[in-house]
Amino acid sequence: MGFLEKQYGVHYAMGGVQAMADAMARIVRAQGGEIRLGTDVDRIEIEGGAARGVTLGTGQRLAAPLVVSNADPGHTYRHLMRAAPRKRWRDKRLKGRRWSMGLFVWYFGTKGTREMWPDVGHHTILSGPRYAPLLKDVFLKGHLADDMSLYIHRPSVTDPSVAPEGDDTFYALSPVPHLGHADPVDWSTMQHRYRDLVAGELERLMPGFRDRITTELTFTPETFRDRYLSPYGSGFSLEPRILQSAWFRPHNVSEEARGLYLVGAGTHPGAGVPGVISSAEVLGQLVPDAPARAAQGLAAE
């Protein structure tokens, strides 16, 4: 990926990730699909070794000839398929996997700053004083250190539509331990303190930015766990080690049930927007087309 970014540059979808999601939603609806927002799936129904639909948190059952899960494979197998026998992705195997780091993400908007800090572009990496020791704290020890390395995203320098005229949109991302360590970070007590530490680092890069903040929102590993059902609040699903990458990740065609397919960061080929979109393209080649009768019905409508 490093070579591709250096050789061909970094692509940005105007309007941001929301524009991509909106475009996908339009395609689904144009094909007669329905999107139910704010709806939890409690389990995937498995009958005779095949996926036959889902049961929602309300108890409603939706029958289907096949099921595609874009939940993290850890959640799909440990929770959504908790009542079904599994041969490969049992709870013990999933618990023994190495999960990626957690993320502390601070989103904020600033007023009247578009012409300020000209050295801060769309993408900025701010390296901390330590490298290998910080990685050990994050990945091995589960220790939340006071020092950090940050990625700063300022999309408004490329896409003015993401902020009011003259203003800016930012997020600052810091790698932090996930919640699966022996003594996980209690973010209910640490969130505001860590936000202040991040602000102190950013102040060196963008003097005076704190006085211009108009809105803000913070995500912690607890947010990723509760909002996105990510195991241990990990930011990128399974850690992309050699034996947890590409083909060694849970397969797009589930090994546990016929008619069950996986898509997203935790499956092949991996995490990140390019990886997730690629997994959808892979699935487009693997999932059978809708039966002709259903297609004719949609055309008639």
Where are these regions (language model features)?
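Flexible, glycine/charged-enriched surface loops at secondary-structure junctions
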Residues: 34, 38, 208-217, 294, ...
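Active-site-proximal substrate-binding core of FAD-dependent oxidoreductases
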Residues: 43-46, 219, 288-301
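C-terminal segments that line or cap access tunnels to active or ligand-binding sites in enzymes
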Residues: 112-224
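Hydrophobic, well-ordered secondary-structure elements that form the walls
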Residues: 68, 108, 172, 202, ...
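Mid-domain catalytic core of redox enzymes
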Residues: 13, 42-164
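A glycine-rich dinucleotide-binding beta-alpha-beta segment and adjacent secondary-structure elements
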Residues: 145-153, 204-269
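Helical element adjacent to the flavin cofactor pocket in flavoenzyme catalytic cores
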Residues: 1-57
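A conserved FAD-binding loop/helix module that cradles the flavin
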Residues: 265-288
